[in-house]
Amino acid sequence: IITLGVMIFGVFGSQKSFDQLDSLPKDTESVRSFELLREGFSPGRLSPTNIFIENENIDLFDPKVVENFETLAKDILSTNLVDDVSYYVRPFGSYSDIGSSTILQSHKRNDSQLKPLFERSAQFISNDKNVVKFEVVLNVNPYSNEALDFIPNLRDVVNQSIESSSISESITYIGGETAEAFDTRKSGDRDTYLVL
């Protein structure tokens, strides 16, 4: 019984890692490239977190809807672990000099000079225009426990911002590798207690 108790304690006391690079030798090219990325850029660029907002009853180009999405982006950006947010009216990130009015013009006018802006912006809108994607870059390793622990907070921020807006009937989803790792960890923790 004592041996079994020690083994169970070891299961609960162990630190799980969801960073696949932890299992590789430190001198491999993929590990080194991530280290270079982390040194020169925000570590979250390796694997951005995606937020999908689904709503069949809104016009994405309505100024009020755009304002609601801009507020959502500011709310997300105000959290302590977020470095940048990109979405259809800010497809180059929140700090880009290209304003939302220029991006919206690219959707309205067939202008060859605006085509690259339109194409970049369109990557954040589903073909049927019912789903908008926000790309969130964290300022920490997206596979770290700190990043995984942040996912419920991010979900709360998104839901509160949406609920207090004119697009409150929208359905939100948080995706990407960090959110997937959080859900996997949560399921694994629950299953461990059930098994033991």
Describe every region a protein language model picked out.
Residues 1-19, 32:
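Signature of alpha-helical transmembrane segments and their immediate interfacial
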Residues 18-196:
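Structured non-transmembrane domains adjacent to transmembrane bundles in polytopic membrane proteins
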